[in-house]
Amino acid sequence: MSKITISPKKGKQGIGAGVWNLGIGTDPFGGPTRRNIPILERIPLLAEAGITYIEAHDVEIGMDQVPAAKRVLSRYGLKMGMYTPSFFADPVFKDGAMTSNDPAVRKLALRNALQAVDATVELGAEVMVFWNGREGFDFVLAKSGRDAFRRMLDGFNAVGEYARKNYGKNAPVFALEPKPNEPRANMYLSTVGEVLYLISRLDRANQPLFGVNPEVAHSRMAGLDYIWDVELCLEAGKLFHIHLNSQDTCRYDQDLPFGYIEPIKDLALCVVLQDAKWEGILAFDVKAPRTDVEEDIADILHTSAANLQRLWAKALKVDRKKVAGYRSTQQYTALAGYLAKCLY
């Protein structure tokens, strides 16, 4: 099974993907359309799709499963690219985790987060992601926003202190993943800017450990430009991870194949990452659709990877001097035409 690589690229050239990408086909309006493939059996499917770096939640690979997961990863020559605690699946987190109004739930969330740090290190991942999941509100004044912000500061500071104390220079870094809505009507840390502000308020000793995991679809759901979101993270030195997919306008989170909806913007994103010499993992957060049968469940990864390889190669051929020239003369329509020529 050959690994798909993005080359030439600084740093990590393999592609990442989550075990949840190969799910059972549920959505809010319908049950499963495929059998639930056991998590460790999904790893070989990811390997067959050319993936190098695996991603998983703690509810998918718990601490008790870490030894078995490491054996499977080793057998297929894979690595753990990212690990993340689920602060949304368990009903106890129905009103949030770190921002819950229930102190017992906040205590449980912190315990789970610290256990996830241990699992991240044990699995050999360098990055642990926090997705804002159910951190938010559906009714006005259901939570005090200022209290919620302070609770997040307290929680993330505790995670940072734990990682520094127990793992020192071997501590993973933490990437906060913004999303504006879904499953909550209004979510805290809804944009890259909010995440960067929160990081600036963490204890100074913890700030270097925290960055951002921007996702294409989440930026588009917020009506924002994901290229600028990524550039902002790069400018702040906080692009710790990235999730690639596609999103058809400001609708529900679709997790469509990368390169499908806005290929010119995806081409431009590759240009930005190349020029920044970014060394992290290019990872997919996509979802096999309900209509795909089990035999085709990895098609979304094959399609995303093929699109990424093509776009990356085309981006390498974009003449940066021409782009600079169009900028200097403010010939933006001509620039758009040039990029279309590079793409098509």
Put a short name on every predicted segment.
Residues 1-50, 74, 140-141, 154-164, ...:
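Histidine-acidic metal/acid-base catalytic patches
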Residues 52-53, 79, 126, 279:
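Residue-level detector of anion-binding/catalytic polar loops
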Residues 17-23, 85-87, 130-135, 176-179, ...:
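Short loop/turn segments at strand-loop or loop-helix junctions that form parts
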Residues 12-20, 61, 66-87, 119-124:
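Glycine-rich, aromatic-flanked loop segments that form ligand/cofactor-binding clefts
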Residues 35, 39, 82-89:
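Aromatic- and acidic-residue-enriched carbohydrate-binding clefts of CAZyme catalytic domains
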Residues 2-7, 75, 79, 92-211, ...:
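Active-site acidic/histidine proton-transfer and metal-coordination neighborhood
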Residues 53-73, 132, 138:
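Glycine-rich, proline-tolerant flexible connector loops at the mouths of alpha/beta enzymes
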